[in-house]
Amino acid sequence: MITATVRYKLPPHIDYTACREHFHKIAPGFRQVSGLLSKHFIWSESGWAGGVYQWETLEDAKAFYSGPWLDGIVERYGMRPSIEFYEVFALTDNARGTVELFKEPVLG
């Protein structure tokens, strides 16, 4: 499993309310993204926003971030996002009452 963090600076005309409304509008569309397990839409008072994504594979993540999604981010926010990838070693899910250990290396 891969976790990716994506961040971009919001332009001045996109405030908290506009960002929240946009995220609410686009969230259902991520149900169809191949290899995406989950996405958290995030916002900070510092004026940065983005997402924390859980992916099945690094290949799925890289394919998504290099496609039309990237063009949309650059067009909407006026900058290329910062994207970092992390290998997940273990996942504690308190909502489901589970702990999952990932023993096969993904990145290293």
Question: Residue locations for each model-derived region?
Answer:
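A common structural junction motif
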Residues: 71-75
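Short S/T/G/P-rich N-terminal loop/turn motif that feeds into the first structured element of a domain
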Residues: 1-48, 58-66, 77-108
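Conserved RNP beta-strands of RNA recognition motif
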Residues: 51-55
